Amino acid sequence: MIKLMKYLKKSAGYIVLIIALLFLQAYCDLSLPDYTSKIINVGIQQKGIEDSVPDKLRDSTLQNLQIFMDEDQKKEVSQNYTQEEDTWVLNDDISKETRENLNEDFSKAMMMVSAFSEDSEQGQAMVAQMGLPEGTDPLTALAQMPEEAVQQIMSQVDEKLKDMPESIVTQAGVSFVASEYEALGKDVDAIQMHYILMSGIRMLAMALVIMLAAISVTFISARVAGRLGHDLRNSIYRKVMSFSSREYHKFSTASLITRSTNDVQQVQQVMAMMFRIVLYAPILGIGGVIKVLNTDSSMTWILGVAVGLILIVIFVLFQVAMPKFTILQTLIDRLNLVSREILTGIPVIRAFSREKHEEDRFEKANLDLTKTNLFVNRCMTFMMPIMMLIMNGVSVLIIYSGAHAVDNGTMQVGNVMAFIQYAMQIIMSFLMITAMSIMLPRANVAALRIDEVLKTEVSIQDPETPVHPSESVKGEIEFDHVSFAYPEAGENVLTDISFKAKKGQTIAVIGSTGSGKSTLINLIPRYYDVTKGSVKVDGVDVRDMTQKELRDKLGYVPQKGVLFSGTIDSNIRYGKPEITDAQVKEAAEVAQATEFIDTKPEKYKSPVSQGGTNVSGGQKQRLSIARAIAKEPEIFIFDDSFSALDFKTDSQLRKALKEYTKDATTVIVAQRISTILGADQIIVLDDGHMAGIGTHKELMANCEVYQQIARSQLSEEELA
């Protein structure tokens, strides 16, 4: 997958936006457990009172609290409270740090006031110890004590507070504040309801932000992934179009189709999910760990156990399943190849009654793919149940440990609830990555297969400084001691071929099957590069010209006619779309195609199906010839392109073609000597060597191979 990351450069801005939205979503997601904790701890247990800092308190209460404060604490309280008659009101503009200091000051003092209140055992014991009358207010007695004695009491209290859980100190302070509010006539229930309501509204706002962020990320991710798929398909197409025949033979057609469709789709789907899940999971997981450490560090070992178990499960499953993902894509290629062969070869299969054999062949390819798919899916079905078992086990363990912590006073119920939610978020982040891990290996294999195509070195490339042919020389072909061997082949297919064709000449190539006729003409458009020697067009080596400039000069008609889906008109215009309707008709007339075109209701607008399956072999060849004629090239190349024509049509076509191509060079590969008797030069090939060259008459006089071919096809009267 990493190898294809360069194709995301265009979407860098969108990716940054996605990451920003994911951070926003994670922040809101991680805030919800905190709000839940506060609703339970503060809203329910503390009646909506957040800390020990009262918004308002009586003057008498403040005087009692100040008994247990030092001078600095008294000064800080007086600076942040304003006296209104017999009450003190907290200022509105205090900072968070100041409030924390006040909370610490008030918490200790409130515990002391509660401890030495008139109805407390400790207060009554102190009154009795001091010999004061029964019913004396302990706090009044403390106020009359020397400051040193009070400080000594405070020191003893501080020692006890060190071992006391913070939650107990907080609860004591909050209870004191609630009692003070009730004494002042404030509605504590209203305070509680207001706190819960406002927290709920904030949670709803957070949920709305999460929803909007998730929708936005999904939308943008789909857009980025769609663009990636588009760019990959374009890149594969451009790369494949630049392939020479050597590279085409490296990849099967079925494999190239699979790579540009199924493999790209795999990468596109995973990329869309990766932005939503793979990027989000670590953000959520790391954020959850930070929140857990802030909540309570005594239970983090539970998360360590959970994460360790998850990693072990993932590792084991991947060791088993990963090799199969690679095999899976190969088997898909194989199934596509078999399907394509069967579908394109149905007439032959039926003719030889091989339906059962092909059915078995398809069944084997299908069964192999099914077995591998089942193996992978069976492995992955274990993953989610095991993960859920770990998740539920962690929940039980947290509740068990948390219950003990609550019982000991070291945690509040809300903190336990928050810890569970954070733990679930951390585990869920691993679950999300695990879910992606089912698709990632297969997508990674698909990405590697795509990259294999894109990284393939093209053997035939344009020169850095191309040479342009002279305008004075047109339609000239020269083979100069050309030898050629197919890549990785031991022997030459062509050896030391030399000839020259000038403008207006017709060159025919004849020979037995496998003698190298088609190979020879494939060197002219540079489908292959020669092994030795050179092929020149218009006086320039084809390797020194750009492929476009070279092929613009050629009108090529392959041995097997190839048509494209569209209309007859679009197929004839294929090489030169800008030609007029009159030129289209003229090309069809020369190719003897008007005979069947005019019989169709829609004439030139008649549809042609993919591969030209709705026209006969002869009609396909004539339309292919018309396409080459319409291009008006300097050089015509016919690779046994008249084989599907009857003698009458063949004769009429050659006669019209000779007149039309009198100013162009024509190269014809032929099987029948009768069709090339009038050629200016006939090249005779025998096992890759040039057995002879000349006119029909010259070859009959001095070329034994040509004589054998001629006598096998024509009678003595025809030869004479």
Feature names for model-found ranges:
Residues M1-L32, T36-M203, V209, A213, ...:
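Membrane-integrated ABC transporters
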Residues S11, F23-S31, L204-I215, V267-V270, ...:
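Hydrophobic alpha-helical transmembrane bundles that constitute the permease/transmembrane domains
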Residues I15-V16, D51, L65-I67, E71-D72, ...:
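ABC-type nucleotide-binding domain
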Residues I39, Q46, T344, D360, ...:
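ABC transporter TMD-NBD coupling linker
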Residues I44-D51, R58-L65, D70, P138-P146, ...:
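Short intracellular "coupling" helices and adjacent cytoplasmic loop segments at the cytosolic face
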Residues G135, P146, I153, S245-R246, ...:
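An intracellular "coupling" helix at the cytosolic face of ABC transporter transmembrane type-1 domains
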Residues G287, K291-G308, I312-I314, F318-Q319, ...:
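Helix-loop-helix
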